[in-house]
Amino acid sequence: MTTGFLQKIFGSRNQRLVKQYQKTVAAINALEPQIEKLTDDQLRGKTDEFRQRIAAGESLDKLLPEAFAVCREASRRVLKMRHFDVQLIGGMVLHYGKIAEMRTGEGKTLVATLPVYLNALAGRGVHVVTVNDYLAQRDAEWMARLYNFLGLSVGINLSGMEHDQKQQAYAADITYGTNNEFGFDYLRDNMVYETDARVQRALNFAVVDEVDSILIDEARTPLIISGQAEDHTELYVRMNALPPLLERQIGEEKADGTGVEKPGDYTLDEKSRQVFLTESGHEKAERLLAEWGLIGEGESLYAPQNITLMHHVYAALRAHTLFHKDQHYVVQNGEVVIVDEFTGRLMAGRRWSDGLHQAVEAKEHVKIQSENQTLASITFQNYFRMYAKLAGMTGTADTEAYEFNEIYGLETVVIPTNRPPKRIDKQDQIYKTAKERYDAVIRDIRECYERGQPVLVGTTSIENSELLSHLLTQAGLPHEVLNAKQHEREAAIVAEAGRPKRITIATNMAGRGTDIVLGGNAEKQAAFLEADDSIPPDEKARRIKQLHDEWETLHEQVKAAGGLHIIGTERHESRRIDNQLRGRAGRQGDPGSSRFYLSLDDPLLRIFAGDRVRSIMDRLKMPEGEAIEAGIVTRSIESAQRKVEARNFDIRKQLLEYDDVSNDQRKVIYQQRNELLEAHDITETISAMRHGVITEVVHQFVPAGSIEEQWDVPELEEVLRNDWQLDLAIQEMVNESSSITAEEILEAVTSAADEQYEAKVAMVGRESFSAFERSVMLQTVDRLWREHLAALDHLRQGIHLRGYAQKNPKQEYKREAFELFAAMLDAIKQEVTRIVMNVQVQSPEQLEEAAEQIEEQGGHLENVEFQHADYAESGAPVANVAVAAAATADMVGSAMTHGGAGGEMPKVGRNDPCPCGSGKKYKQCHGKLS
C-alpha cells in the first residue's frame, strides 16, 4: 500500500527512467539543425572525429547525444527513416545495458542502429544477435547501407560459412548473426590448435533481438558439439516393441491403497512430463525382455549389468507416451526433426538427448542416428553473461522482468509507443469441447472475411494448424497456413497477412520479426520492381506509384473494417507468448482486436484449471455450443499460467545453478588452453608437472618421512623402468648407504628424469621439442576434458537421488564435481609427463611429424555434430543432462614410439586390458586417476 502511494507521487522506476532519458532526447533534438547542415562527407567525417575523441579518453556516455544525432541524420538520408523520440529512448536503454520492451511495429531494428553505431566507434566489435539466419541476413543487408555510409564495416556470421569468411565477419566493426552460431563459434575457438585459427574477438557488446526468445525460451537448451560414440541402434529397435505391450494406469495410488481407477503398467505425469513403470509394469517388462533374450531368466532390470537396458526401456516409453508426431516433431526426408514448442519452427540439426531422439526414430521406423559424446557445451545463460555489456529488445519482456534481473542482471524498461495503441483485447471464450471451440472460431473468421477484415489465427502445434486448415477448407474459406513446414515462405506470407479478407494460420510465433502492415506490404513489391532492370525507368516509376496508391486504398479499407483481428485457439503456458500473438495487431496506432477461444480439453486448462471451470459450467447449466465469458475464468487461467511460468523459472534457475559448476571449470580449462596456445615456451610448465608426478610416484612406494622398513624399492624400480623409462639402481643406493632418506631417493629420481628430458631436447632442439610438448598438452587437455564432461553428465543424471538420503543434491554435485575436476587436472599432469618421458626421439623431423599427427587427430574429430539439444524436454529430472558415452581412445599413442620396445605404442581405451599385463582394466590400473 505504501509502495503504491509513493509511486503515485514519484512515479514508478520505469517512468522515472523514461523521464530522465527524455532530457537527453531534448539535447539530441537541439543538435539536429546543425547536423542537418553537414554535407555527406562532413557527416561521414564525424565517425573519425568520434574515434579520435574516444582514443583521447572521452567516454561513450558523453558522446551519446552527438553520436545519436549523427546516426539519426544518416538514417534519414540513407534509409529515408528518421528515428522518433521514443526510438532514441530505446537506443539509450540498449546502450546502458538494459532490455527495451517495445511494441510490435515500433521499429526495433532501426532502434538498434543507435547503440550499435555508438559502441562500434570504440573498435572492440559489436554483435547483433537474431533468432534465425533469415533475420540476420535481412537486418545486416538492410542496415549495412547506413553503417557503410558512416564508415563502419558490417559482417554476417551464418552457419556453414568458410573459416576465412567467419574471421572477416568477426573482424568487422559490427557483426550480425544467430545466437546458435555465436555460441558454437565460442566453443569451436576453444578446440583449435593454433591462435590464428580462432575467429572470435573478445566478447564486448551484444544487442540481442527477441531477447525473451533467446535468453528465456532457449535458456534450458545447451549448445553441444558432439562426436560419435558407441552404437546401440539394434537395441533401440528391439525396445520399440515394448511400449505397445504395456498399458497405462489411470489414477495415482494413495497411501491407503485407493486412487487407482484402472490398474496398468505405467503412470504418466503430464504436468512434469514424466513416465514411471509400476510394480506390475516392471515384472511384465522383465518377463518380456527375458523372452526376447535381452536379460537372463529371473534377472532384475535393476541388476548392475542391466542398467543400460533400463535406460532404453524408459527412452522407448517416453517416445511413445510423451512425444507426438506433428506436435513435438515431424518426420521429414526420413529424419525426425524437432518442432520448437515456443515458436513452432523446425529445429533442423537439433536432437533430444539421453537416447530419446533415437527412441523416437525407432518408433517412426526411420534410420536411427548414432548416439553422441559431448566434446564441448555451453548454455546461452553462461555464454551471454560473458559479454562485457549485454542489452536486448523485444515486444514482450515485462512479464519476465524478474527473471532477466535475477539471472542476467538486466533491467527491463518499457518504452512508450509513438502513437497510442488502439487494439481491443476481448474476453476469452471457453467451451466444453474442442469441437465447439473450433465451430466458434470458424464463425468468427467467416464474419471477419465477409466484412473484409484480415485475420491471423494462432495455434500451438502443427497438428492443430492443419486441423483448422481442414475445417476452413470445408467451410469454403480461402487461407494461408504458416507453420514450421513452410519455414522458407513464412516472411512472404506474413508480409501479406494484412490484406483485406486475408486469413492466415500461424503456429505460435512463426514469422516473428516481420511486420504485418494493414493493406499488405507495398514496399516489398516495390523493391522487386526496382530490382527488375528489364523495365524502363518511366514505366517503373509509374508502376511503383500505382502500387502505393493501391496500398493507400487497401490500408484505409482494412482500417475501416477494424484492422487485423487476432484469434488464439489455445492459451500457451506462458502469458508472454500469448502477448506476442496479440501484439501482431495494432502496430503504430493502427486499429486491431484479439480474442482467445479455449476448450476444457486444452492441456493448460485440463492440467491446472479444468475441474474448477467445468464445475462453474455445470452449475450454470451451460447448453452445448454456449461459451462462458467471465473475468473470473480468465483470471483463473492467468493464475494457472503464472504457476507454469514460476515452475519453468525454477527449472531454468536450477539448471543454471548446476551449469555454473561446469561453467567455472570450463573457464579454467579454456583459460589454460589459451595460455598454452599463446605461450612460446612451456618448458617451466612441463618441468613443474614432471616434478609433481615423479614426487607422487616415489612417495607411493617410499613415503616422505618414512623409515626403510616401510619402503617398497623393487616395486618402485619396476614402475620407473616400465612407466617412465628410468632405469635406476635404487636398491644398490640403499644397500650402499646406511643413512639414505626418502628425500634423497626422490632427489636422485628427479635428477635422472631431468637429465633424460634434457638429452631429448638437446637431440632435436628446444623449439621443435617445445612445439611437440604443446601439441601433446593440448590434445591431452581436450581428451580428458571430454571424459570429464561425460563423468559430470553421469553424475548429474543420478544426483537427485541423494535427496532420499537427506542430502542436498546441489551441494553434493558441487562437492563431487570439484573432486572429479581435481582428479582430471592430476590425470592431465600424469598423461603429459608419461608421453613426454616415453617418447623416443631420433630426429627433429620425426618429432614435428608426431606433433602434426597429434594435432590432426585432436583437431579433426570424426562425425562432429553441432546440436542445440533440449535437455529439459527429455522428460528426465531437472538435474538430468545428456549421458555422454564411453571415453574416446588414446589418440596420442599412434603419434610416437614407445621407449624400450622400439615399436608403436598401442592405443589403449579406458575399458581395455592394461598393457602392463596386470589383467585389470586400463582405467583401474595405469590409467587410474590418482
Curated annotation (Swiss-Prot):
Pfam families tied to this protein:
P-loop_SecA, SEC-C, SecA_DEAD, SecA_PP_bind, SecA_SW
GO cellular component term of the entry, any: plasma membrane
* Positions with a binding annotation for ATP: 87, 105-109, 515
User: Keyword Cell membrane, does the record have it?
Assistant: yes
Q: What is its main location?
A: membrane
Sites binding Zn(2+) sit at 914, 916, 925-926
- Catalysed reactions listed for this entry: ATP + H2O + cellular proteinSide 1 = ADP + phosphate + cellular proteinSide 2
Has keyword Cell inner membrane? yes
UniProt-listed Enzyme Commission number(s): 7.4.2.8
Q: What class of enzyme is it?
A: translocase
- Mind listing the GO molecular function terms for this protein? ATP binding; metal ion binding; protein-exporting ATPase activity
UniProt-listed InterPro entries: Helicase_ATP-bd (IPR014001), Helicase_C-like (IPR001650), P-loop_NTPase (IPR027417), SEC_C_motif (IPR004027), SecA (IPR000185), SecA_CS (IPR020937), SecA_DEAD (IPR011115), SecA_motor_DEAD (IPR014018)
- Essential cofactor(s): Zn(2+)
Its keywords, alphabetically, are: ATP-binding, Cell inner membrane, Cell membrane, Cytoplasm, Membrane, Metal-binding, Nucleotide-binding, Protein transport, Translocase, Translocation, Transport, Zinc
The biological process GO terms on file are: intracellular protein transmembrane transport; protein import; protein targeting; protein transport by the Sec complex
Q: Where in the cell is it found?
A: Cell inner membrane; Cytoplasm
The UniProt entry, under Gene3D superfamilies, shows: Helical scaffold and wing domains of SecA, P-loop containing nucleotide triphosphate hydrolases, SecA, preprotein cross-linking domain
Copy out the cofactor comment: May bind 1 zinc ion per subunit.
Q: What does this protein do?
A: Part of the Sec protein translocase complex. Interacts with the SecYEG preprotein conducting channel. Has a central role in coupling the hydrolysis of ATP to the transfer of proteins into and across the cell membrane, serving both as a receptor for the preprotein-SecB complex and as an ATP-driven molecular motor driving the stepwise translocation of polypeptide chains across the membrane.
Q: Which family does it belong to?
A: Belongs to the SecA family.
| Subunit-structure text | Monomer and homodimer. Part of the essential Sec protein translocation apparatus which comprises SecA, SecYEG and auxiliary proteins SecDF-YajC and YidC.
Question: What protein am I looking at?
Answer: Protein translocase subunit SecA
Question: Highest lineage ranks of the organism?
Answer: Bacteria, Pseudomonadati, Pseudomonadota, Betaproteobacteria, Burkholderiales
Q: What gene name does this entry carry?
A: secA
